[in-house]
Amino acid sequence: KIQSGNDLTSGTGTYTVTFTNPFYSDNYAVGISAQGLATGDYYSLGSKTINGFNIAFKNSGGSGVSRTFDYLAKGY
């Protein structure tokens, strides 16, 4: 099963991606393509469940920043 999202805006906090159709297991792969990152920006994924996952973008100082991203999730 593959699920994806395009041009999502994270906001400055934690963004929750919710799948339309849950996976059977939380052992799926997630690929992220971030747009408009500044030097030193990074993201972290967390709370992967069968229903979705969380993502947060931060700048080099560790403060939350709003960024646009695409994702692709593949699993069972």
What spans do the regions from the language model cover?
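Extracellular attachment/recognition segments
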Residues: 1-76
